[in-house]
Amino acid sequence: MNKKLKNNLEKKIRVIPNFPKKGIQFQDITSITDSKQLFTEVVNEISKYCKKNKFTKVAGIEARGFIFGSAVAYKLGLPFIPIRKKGKLPGKIVKQKYKLEYGMDEIQIHKHSITFRDKVLIVDDLIATGGTASAAAKLISKLGVKKIEFFMIIDLWNLKGSKKISKSYQIRSLM
């Protein structure tokens, strides 16, 4: 990994305690998108990995995964697949339910957007407990995809999400 980029990210990303609720340490990634240089470096780093590993599609988890995933897809001339929250996509969809701290949620993609031949890189801003990431991989697997990997900006390693995901999928992060 790019140590200079990691150091720059660690300096720039603001941590907001108790937002949006008590006990959460919110990682504010707008300091990345506010900086042309830092945003470009992040997109370039993910793009380099994506190109090297010959992914055919880039998926992004709603909402902040859209920011980085779509930029990577654009840079490489690849299709971008939005992984949306329940009720946000018209037409034929594939869905996956997953557990939240209090209850259940669901994510969806268009059924026609991915085929079994695709190699999909899932991009998001961070991984915490791994629940949403795991659901995203299961969702894409339902379409027969064999190569699925993750690239996150931030790994909140103390919440063990990356450890959970790495049992089944390759996962990379910038910090």
Functional labels for PLM-detected ranges:
Residues 1-55:
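Active-site-facing substrate-recognition patch
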Residues 19, 134-175:
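PRPP-dependent phosphoribosyltransferase catalytic core
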Residues 54-62:
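Short glycine-rich phosphate-binding loop at a beta-alpha junction
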Residues 56-57, 119-121:
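Structural motif
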Residues 67-76:
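Short Gly/Thr/Asp-enriched flexible loops that form oxyanion-binding sites at enzyme active sites
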Residues 76-77, 97-101, 166-169:
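Short, hinge-like loop/turn segments at secondary-structure boundaries
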Residues 81-120:
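Short, glycine/charge-rich flexible loops or terminal/linker lids adjacent to PRPP-binding catalytic cores
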Residues 125, 130:
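Conserved G/P- and acidic residue-centered "switch" motifs that form tight phosphate/ATP-binding loops
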